[in-house]
Curated annotation (Swiss-Prot):
CC terms in the record's Gene Ontology section: nucleoplasm
The protein's role, per its UniProt record: Sequence-specific transcription factor which is part of a developmental regulatory system that provides cells with specific positional identities on the anterior-posterior axis.
Matching SUPFAM superfamilies: Homeodomain-like
Protein's cellular compartments: Nucleus
Protein name: Homeobox protein Hox-A4
Low complexity bias locations: 63-73
Pfam families according to UniProt: Homeodomain
Organism annotation: Ovis aries
Amino acid sequence: AYTRQQVLELEKEFHFNRYLTRRRRIEIAHTLCLSEAQVKIWFQNRRMKWKKDHKLPNTKMRSSNSGSASAGPPGKPQTQSPHLHPH
């Protein structure tokens, strides 16, 4: 398990870089008294969490946007306007 301080530093680094160079991974591991493997695996897991977290809001936004556009009258002018542009 990681200490709060280690997680804080790892999160801070992740905020700036989702991928580490080997040199940076060695520096972080040394600074936080972790092995390179621990840092590498933490970043792999964190990237997966990040991808999951960022997929959900996008799909929700898409479904709500498409739902609102097709549900009401505002959808009609939107469907007509693309026909006006090509001609």
